[in-house]
Amino acid sequence: MSNVPADLRYAKSHEWLKLEADGTATIGITDYAQSSLGDITYVQLPKVGAALKAGETFGVVESVKAASDLYAPAGGTVVAVNAELDSAPDAVNRAPYAEGWMLKLKLANPADANALLNAADYGKLLG
């Protein structure tokens, strides 16, 4: 069974979003996604300052099994990327909700997070 933290919001494309106290949102891929991909070998992320729209591709994650596009669960401006993933992409496998975070967004509309799935609904999606 995949780990689905209750304090996060989830996209059907298996990205998670955490609203932070400073109004930004931290984004990564779910435990289910990293488990399905297998050992992650490379993560391509956007540059700080990039503008993203909800549902738009923001990067790529490559594993021993496949390469998969990453989709923005909400729109906004990239204010930080996890540069540690350049040298340690396996952090996404080890801790997808902690050290394996991918980027931080200044949300264009914080209410966009409400359109995402809560933990219970995401759990149902996974079966």
Swiss-Prot record:
- Give the matching Pfam families: GCV_H (PF01597)
Q: Which residues form the Lipoyl-binding domain?
A: 24-106
Query: Which coenzyme or cofactor does it need?
Result: (R)-lipoate
Residues bearing N6-lipoyllysine are: 65
How many cofactor units bind, and how? Binds 1 lipoyl cofactor covalently.
Q: Name one GO biological process term.
A: glycine decarboxylation via glycine cleavage system
Example of a GO cellular component annotation carried by this entry: glycine cleavage complex
Q: Does Metal-binding show up as a keyword for this record?
A: no
Q: Which residues cross the membrane?
A: none
**Which InterPro entries does this UniProt record tie to the protein?**
2-oxoA_DH_lipoyl-BS, Biotin_lipoyl, GCV_H, GCV_H/Fam206, GCV_H_sub, Single_hybrid_motif
- Alphabetically ordered keywords of this record: Lipoyl
Which PROSITE patterns does the record cross-reference, listed alphabetically? BIOTINYL_LIPOYL, LIPOYL
What function does the entry list? The glycine cleavage system catalyzes the degradation of glycine. The H protein shuttles the methylamine group of glycine from the P protein to the T protein.
Tell me which family the UniProt entry assigns to this protein: Belongs to the GcvH family.
PANTHER family referenced in this protein's UniProt entry, alphabetically: GLYCINE CLEAVAGE SYSTEM H PROTEIN, GLYCINE CLEAVAGE SYSTEM H PROTEIN-RELATED
**UniProt name for this protein:** Glycine cleavage system H protein
Species, as recorded: Opitutus terrae (strain DSM 11246 / JCM 15787 / PB90-1)
